Amino acid sequence: MQEAKCFQKTRQLFESPIRTSDKRARARRAGTLIVCSCVVLGMCGAFAPRGRAASGKGCTVSETNFDGWKAEQLANQWVKLEIVPQLGGRLMQVTFGDHDFLYINNQLKGQYMPPDTEQHRWFNYGGDKIWPMPEGSQDEQHWAGAGGEPLDDAPYDLQVLSHGPTCAVRLTGPVDPQIGQQYIRDISITGESPAISFHAVMKNVSGYPQTWSEQSVSQYNAASPNDPTQFNPDFWGVTPANPQSSYLNGYHVRTGNPTNSGYSVKDGLFRVHWNNMGGEVWTDSPGGWVAVVDGTTSYTMLERRKFEPTAEYPDKSTIIFFTTGARNRPGPPPAQTAQPAEPPRPPTYYMEAEVNSPMIELAPGESYAMDSQWYPTRMDSSFQGATYSGVTGTPLAAAATPNGLVLTGNFGVLYPGQLIAHFYNRGGEAIGTAPAGDANPLQPLKLQITLQAPPETARVSVHVVDTQGLDRGPLGEAFVNPPPPAPEGRGGGGQ
């Protein structure tokens, strides 16, 4: 535990934004690095050794070959992460149980194409990466795109930061002269849960102040699990809708068909339903999370990062979805030619979930970090929302019966451990708890349990307590139906 805390403090101090004139901040940073280097890294002044699988309290870091690429694998009993530094520092795959979340371009498997600085072609390998925002070609304050850019396609340096109890690597990218930025990203897991942590740093390496947003771009595989030549008809992207949205209808269709029936706002959520109509849609979601839901397999990925309500986001967008598929725009008829037609390319099915940071002005040498977390879990297309301990399909319900208090609901949990029911009376006083079953992120939680609750119980909540005994928060909360009788004699005569 001391190692994990020291590692976190070192990372925060080392990469937090400081002014070059702040001598005290630099001194604190240097002192913390000296004190913690042996604790965090296992040796003074060096990174953890590579070249072998190293385990520590339930997680491993190892070199591997992934689909023909030299990769680094982070793994625990729930997840495997395949990181390919050569491909612009991409996280190429996240496997949860036996389910692969991310899209991989089969035509480029095992290949590497250096940045095309002449024709500016973009090579889409798939996976997950960091890009700058805003995009555009109108001035130097917009990014013209990934084609030929070092930050997207040049090799990144990889360093193993720790082998346990936190398994962490750092990816350091090249300087990108187009935007004057350098990206540095830490990716880590522990042995305690399937949660994945990201610490993405953008650093101004130019000689003048610059303002940018950094964006996590994750390509999720939207092909049918039964036939990869077909799209998955039960595939969704979900994020909280903004009730005071700056966009008409609560979202902005940037590319594609503006009347795409796959876009909807209902019950406080913006949803993208995959329907083979490609396009990009922007939202100004204030919720701080985005979920990608595969209703066919009941696997869901929840991404979280802190939303800053007073900050400026690129063109007001906080969460963006992009889907491949037909653009549904008329084009010219095919030319009549005697030349044989090229064989059609295989279909490409993926959904991008793009998470934006605020727009940040950085002086030369300054840096900014966006922290985010991924939580793989189980949930189908009944998905209705997220808490800090899980996702909800059917909300919690509590029914008083002669046999006891019956709790029901459908959830996906983010942490392994135990479910604990908390009981409250009409006055909101805590009057007891009871175990309500096990929490397993790899299994859908179909809650159906009868508990012996105190007779005055008027409200109940169900929390997830992890294997370390830490309360991760409620899955849901509900009033008991029918409610218990009101106590007599209170307030002059009962209610």
What kind of feature is each model-predicted range?
Residues 54-59, 316-490:
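Terminal accessory/anchoring regions of large secretory-pathway or extracellular enzymes
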Residues 1-27:
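N-terminal secretory signal peptides that target proteins for export/translocation
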Residues 85-86, 94-96, 173-224, 371-373:
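Acidic, contiguous internal or C-terminal segments within carbohydrate-active enzymes
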Residues 72, 79-81, 89-93, 205-213, ...:
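A contiguous, surface-exposed recognition patch within enzymatic or periplasmic domains that forms
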Residues 31-46:
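Bacterial N-terminal signal peptides
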Residues 75-151, 307-338, 350:
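Acidic-aromatic substrate-binding/catalytic surfaces of carbohydrate-active enzymes
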Residues 55-66, 71, 134-193, 221-226, ...:
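Extended, loop-rich substrate-binding clefts of extracytoplasmic carbohydrate-active enzymes
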Residues 78-83, 196-204, 365, 407-409:
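Short, well-ordered beta-strand segments enriched in hydrophobic/aromatic residues
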